[in-house]
């Protein structure tokens, strides 16, 4: 099982909070424009045709930010999240079908 999302990111927008999944692989392909990929190890530009993969269980928080003056477009492949999702920059965890604080208590 997997899903595909077609995403148009407006200038100044981010794809999400930086995150990583315990049980979901993610793969993205840039279609148009330029986005900045922000990961644990730094930042890099993605241009049309560039790809990025995020293996499940690897604690590499990531997201895309559009720091350009025009829209950027990409597709991301993954499966519906069933496991935990971690957000390293904020006090947030998706676990057991609920939003929780990093230490496990519910919001």
Question: Which residue ranges define each predicted feature?
Answer:
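Double-stranded beta-helix
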Residues: 61, 65-107
